[in-house]
């Protein structure tokens, strides 16, 4: 397989001390000031927390690279936009399936983050989202490597997930969190075909199990 090079990395993650805070039993991401990254106030106000987190991380990872040089945006998520999904389903139950606000449903779709990044920079290129739970990022990375193997020069790849109190409670009751700390965050990588002057790392393959 064609070697792939990591040129830039951006991350929004929990604090370094790895201790739950704000009276929450799970690790919550330390979010930046989004006003400096997502400058459109109207757009920013309409975004949910995970969408802002993912879009800001993706834009930071792109840096000063011209949007025309991005041949693809590939995102991955295990559970998607949980807050908006919960909000829409609660409205569905509370209003007995009548007079529903469509915004939470629109914002809860899995491809929202990749689409918003493309819309902000007018990137008319390959755009894909993988939702395979624990294999989501590996699937996105493998897709990016295949696209680069076919001739693409630069691909933006990212993984985003959020944790909510409802999701945490359900996972805990099902025994899914034994021995691990639940958390959330966003991570993006700018991958390229050529090594360039200062690549951060080289990826030679992807192994899943």
Regions found by a protein language model. Give the residues of each.
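Conserved "HGTGT" condensation-loop signature of ketosynthase/thiolase-family condensing enzymes
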Residues: 1-138, 146-152, 160-209
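Short-chain dehydrogenase/reductase
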Residues: 141
């Amino acid at each position: 397989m064609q070697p792939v090079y990591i040129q830039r990395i951006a991350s929004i993650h929990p604090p370094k001390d790895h201790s739950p805070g704000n009276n929450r039993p799970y690790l919550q991401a330390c979010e930046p000031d989004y006003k400096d990254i997502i400058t459109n106030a109207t757009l920013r106000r309409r975004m949910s927390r995970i969408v802002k987190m993912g879009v800001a991380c993706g834009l930071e990872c792109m840096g000063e690279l011209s949007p025309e040089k991005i041949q693809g945006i590939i995102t991955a998520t295990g559970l998607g936009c949980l807050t908006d999904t919960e909000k829409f389903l609660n409205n569905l139950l509370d209003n007995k399936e009548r007079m529903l606000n469509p915004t939470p449903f629109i914002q809860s779709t899995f491809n929202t983050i990749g689409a918003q990044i493309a819309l902000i920079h007018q990137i008319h290129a390959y755009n894909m989202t993988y939702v395979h739970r624990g294999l989501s990022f590996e699937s996105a990375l493998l897709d990016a490597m295949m696209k680069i193997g076919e001739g693409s020069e630069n691909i933006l790849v990212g993984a985003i997930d959020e944790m909510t109190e409802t999701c945490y409670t359900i996972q805990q009751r099902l025994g899914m969190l034994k021995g691990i700390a639940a958390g959330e965050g966003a991570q993006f990588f700018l991958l390229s075909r050529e090594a360039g002057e200062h690549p951060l790392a080289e990826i030679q393959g992807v192994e899943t199990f």
